[in-house]
Amino acid sequence: MNMEEQILNDYLLSQGRLQSIISLEQWRQLFPQRYREDPLIERLYEYCTQQRQKRLAKLRANIHLESQVIGKSRIDRMLATNVEKLQTVSHASTLHDVEEFYTSHSAKPLDISEINERLSEAVQSAYTKLNEEKERCTQLTLKMNSQIASLSDFQWSKEPNVDESIHLVESLIESLEKAAPSAIEELD
């Protein structure tokens, strides 16, 4: 814990707990006489204590986070100052050595025409890939639509399995006609 974090904790959290601000007895004195012994008063005090504890926990977390951010910004400022100092170095060889040592790669910088050419190639490559993917998606969509259309029995107002149903009904009627004379004789 750094010094700033310690100061913020001491200043903001020293009287943070509800019990250090007001006791349960003092809390009860805030309410009318007839309600002072009600258990709800004690539950309300406990609830307020819990809420206060949650706020203090958030405050502690924010203090810690802020101290980390402040520490990081100090480091960033120190690095920026060091970079400025390095940029003002008058001796060219020292500056070149420092730049070479601190750069992440030692590639030679490109001129603007090379950069423009490479960017144009990259854009063209991206457009080519995009068009290929669009064509592939179109082909897949057509294939999917044809498969879905072939599965539909209602295409061209055709009812599903109508021929099979008609055949079953006709065979049932024939068997009933054959059985009907014998059934009529049994009823007589």
From Swiss-Prot:
Recorded GO CC terms: condensed chromosome, centromeric region; cytosol; Mis6-Sim4 complex; nucleus
Subcellular locations according to the entry: Cytoplasm; Nucleus; Chromosome, Centromere, Kinetochore
Disulfides per UniProt: none
Superkingdom of this protein's organism: Eukaryota
Keyword rRNA-binding set for record: no
Keyword Cell division carried by entry: yes
The entry's keywords: Cell cycle, Cell division, Centromere, Chromosome, Chromosome partition, Cytoplasm, Kinetochore, Nucleus
A single BP term in Gene Ontology: cell division
Subunit structure: Component of the inner kinetochore constitutive centromere-associated network (CCAN) (also known as central kinetochore Sim4 complex in fission yeast), which is composed of at least cnl2, cnp3, cnp20, fta1, fta2, fta3, fta4, fta6, fta7, mal2, mhf1, mhf2, mis6, mis15, mis17, sim4 and wip1.
Family: Belongs to the NKP2 family.
Function statement: Component of the kinetochore, a multiprotein complex that assembles on centromeric DNA and attaches chromosomes to spindle microtubules, mediating chromosome segregation and sister chromatid segregation during meiosis and mitosis. Component of the inner kinetochore constitutive centromere-associated network (CCAN), which serves as a structural platform for outer kinetochore assembly.
Protein name (database record): Inner kinetochore subunit cnl2
Species of the source: Schizosaccharomyces pombe (strain 972 / ATCC 24843) (Fission yeast)
